[in-house]
Regions:
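Glycan-processing catalytic domains of CAZymes
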Residues: 45-317
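Sec/Tat signal peptide C-region and signal peptidase I cleavage site
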Residues: 39-44
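N-terminal secretory signal peptides that target proteins for export/translocation
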Residues: 1-24
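Amphipathic, positively biased hydrophobic alpha-helical segments used for protein targeting
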Residues: 23, 31-33, 236
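Short, well-ordered helical secondary-structure segments
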Residues: 17-18, 26, 169, 174
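Bacterial N-terminal signal peptides
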Residues: 28-38
């Protein structure tokens, strides 16, 4: 191919076939490399949007958004459409392999859902596929979750799957068994309960649960911190248990978040999650929605400030 010797190269420098042209081109390449390197550094230095998930909103999207949450769990397209500006949905695909060893939604239903939402601008690209699956009860749970993740990836290559793993004392190998079953693994230790109301939350147990996930081979970039923002003092009389968990105080919340920040730094985590924003009559009450400083500690303002401070954090590499 013949080129005009007066053709302009990068940054307007002329390229010629005359003596010294090769040296000039080397200078051009060097200048280009330096410029691109500077651009790459500038992009890397730009703070990314940190993502915060609120669950059980019961339609209170604006309330959660005002507290700094920019992700909401949704299970219908109408809920996705109702999200306010700046908030995106994590799509709940129904539970599976938790209390029953099957999926609530069939592969066909999941396929239809993924195809319907994957390009929606209000969708985050994250699919919540199971909440606390138990391989001890359902030995094929790791395989079935991995298959569902593979199905979603085949339909939405940019999509990511999310599962919360308990890994409690009764089943301490769940992290190891489920670490490859989904893209993001939620870790949900709830260290504040009625037994330690005087002594304070069990921070050692919180640290140990996080360490268990990391030792199982789940990197920080896949760990989703699940913050305790609920108690059970006002759950309904219809429950079949005695209330155990209690809403953390402001001081306890500060300590818990400091531990999370140490173990799973803000710059690494894909997003974080608060359980729970809204009440669940037999499971969670009071919750973050209620913790506004009136009858309960003002955890809402505390989380608003915590999220605001993240905006200057460095992006994940």
């Amino acid at each position: 191919m013949m080129r005009d010797p007066a053709t302009r190269g990068v940054f307007g420098l002329p390229t010629t076939a005359a003596a010294g042209g090769r040296a000039l081109r080397r200078v051009q390449l060097l200048v280009t490399a330096v410029a691109l390197g500077g651009i790459a550094q500038a992009i890397a230095a730009e703070p990314r949007e940190h993502l915060h998930l609120a669950v059980n909103l019961r339609g209170d999207y604006s309330g959660a958004a005002s507290a700094g949450f920019n992700l909401a769990d949704v299970s219908t397209q109408s809920a996705l459409k109702a999200l306010p500006e700046g908030m995106r949905g994590i799509y709940w695909l129904g539970n599976g392999y938790n209390l029953h060893c099957l999926w609530q939604l069939s592969d066909r239903q999941v396929t239809d859902t993924v195809m319907a939402v994957k390009d929606n601008p209000k969708f985050s690209g994250i699919y919540y596929i199971s909440d606390e699956p138990h391989p001890a009860l359902c030995p094929d749970a790791p395989q079935r979750l991995a298959e569902r993740t593979a199905l979603i990836h085949s339909l939405d290559p940019r999509g990511r799957t999310f599962v919360v793993v308990l890994n409690g004392s009764a089943a301490p190998t769940e992290f190891a068994q489920l670490k490859d079953a989904a893209d993001y693994i939620g870790v949900d230790p709830y260290p504040c309960n009625v037994r330690n109301e005087v002594a304070g939350c069990n921070y050692a147990a919180l640290r140990e649960r996080i360490d268990q996930a990391l030792r199982a081979g789940i990197p920080n970039t896949r760990v989703v911190p699940v913050f305790q923002t609920f108690g059970q003092a006002c759950t309904s009389a219809g429950r079949n248990y005695s209330p155990y968990y209690r809403l953390p105080t402001l001081a306890e919340t500060k300590t818990m978040l400091a531990i999370w920040d140490e173990k799973v730094p803000v710059k690494d985590r894909p997003f974080d999650m608060a359980y729970s924003w809204g009440r669940q009559p037999t499971v969670a009450c009071p919750t973050l929605e209620m913790a506004d400083g009136s009858a309960h500690p003002d955890l809402r303002s505390f989380y608003t400030d915590y999220f605001a401070r993240m905006k200057g954090a460095s992006p994940a590499r």
